[in-house]
From Swiss-Prot:
Sorted UniProt keywords: DNA-binding, Nucleus, Plant defense, Repeat, Transcription, Transcription regulation
Gene knockout outcome: Shorter roots due to increased sensitivity to excess zinc ions (Zn) and iron ions (Fe) deficiency, respectively. Reduced production of root-derived phenolics upon iron ions (Fe) depletion. Plants lacking myb10 and myb72 fail to induce transcript accumulation of the nicotianamine synthase genes NAS4 and NAS2 in iron ions (Fe) deficiency, and exhibits nickel (Ni) and zinc (Zn) sensitivity.
Keyword Transcription in record: yes
One Gene Ontology cellular component annotation held by this UniProt entry: nucleus
Function as written in the Swiss-Prot or TrEMBL entry: Involved in metal ions homeostasis, including iron ions (Fe) acquisition, via the regulation of NAS4 and NAS2 genes expression. Necessary for plant survival in alkaline soil where iron availability is greatly restricted. Involved in the up-regulation of several biosynthesis genes of secondary metabolites involved in iron uptake under conditions of iron deficiency. Triggers tolerance to nickel (Ni) and zinc (Zn) ions. Required in the roots during early signaling steps of rhizobacteria-mediated (e.g. P.fluorescens WCS417r) and beneficial fungi-mediated (e.g.
Bias type Basic and acidic residues, positions: 133-144
Pfam families: Myb_DNA-binding (PF00249)
Compartments it resides in: Nucleus
GO biological process: cellular detoxification of cadmium ion; cellular response to potassium ion starvation; induced systemic resistance, ethylene mediated signaling pathway; regulation of gene expression; response to iron ion starvation; response to molecule of bacterial origin; response to zinc ion; secondary metabolic process
DNA-binding span(s): 39-63, 91-114
Domain HTH myb-type: from-to ranges: 11-63, 64-118
Chain segments carrying region Disordered: 118-144
Protein name in UniProt: Transcription factor MYB72
Amino acid sequence: MGKGRAPCCDKNKVKRGPWSPQEDLTLITFIQKHGHQNWRSLPKLAGLLRCGKSCRLRWINYLRPDVKRGNFSKKEEDAIIHYHQTLGNKWSKIASFLPGRTDNEIKNVWNTHLKKRLTPSSSSSSLSSTHDQSTKADHDKNCDGAQEEIHSGLNESQNSATSSHHQGECMHTKPELHEVNGLNEIQFLLDHDDFDDITSEFLQDNDILFPLDSLLHNHQTHISTQEMTREVTKSQSFDHPQPDIPCGFEDTNEESDLRRQLVESTTPNNEYDEWFNFIDNQTYFDDFNFVGEVCL
């Protein structure tokens, strides 16, 4: 048989369940006469078929004369809350600070009323602490945001000053850049593969692009005009000889002056008009017979 406390009674021979009024009176009478020095032997001495533990609990919790009946006062509840925070669930020690209250009553009132009453307050306290923490976090966040705004404002001011400085430098170098860009555009046009297809009015003016060709063309036209003038003069002189002018006549001063003006003129269209006007003003004789040497 293992070691341990010996049972106080034979459980097969004891009575269980609620106490009767007769049993309560027997216990009260015995304790008032003899006291309760030994709860283990008290049931046999009092003639009760109960366990010693059951007799002790019945006396302490219900039958002793100083036991308080009724509800706990506000002062007693506050004392229970205070001692429970320091001692925990040690109900017998808590009962020693509350005269007339048993440990069982204190435990019952704690589990039934006080514990439920403290739960909302504790939750509210936890909520308040959480709210305080969130408020503090928001405050810190706002402070950080204000500091960031200050730093960003300083950075923007510095950036604006730097950009204005660069803009001033660009304004000083703008004419030079304009000239460089113009030269680059001209070089691009010269290097472009489709340069011949450009339909610019400037490029379509051949006199501007090729001034030497224009001068050469005018010179050739002027030479051809001179040759034509000579041929017409010869043919007119041969076909319609003038009176009093022998064959192989020499040019008159008026005709020489006109021819010299025609040679020196740079307007071919006016040369023809002046020449034909000169021919029309001459007097020819169709029936004039050449006498003498025939001009070949």
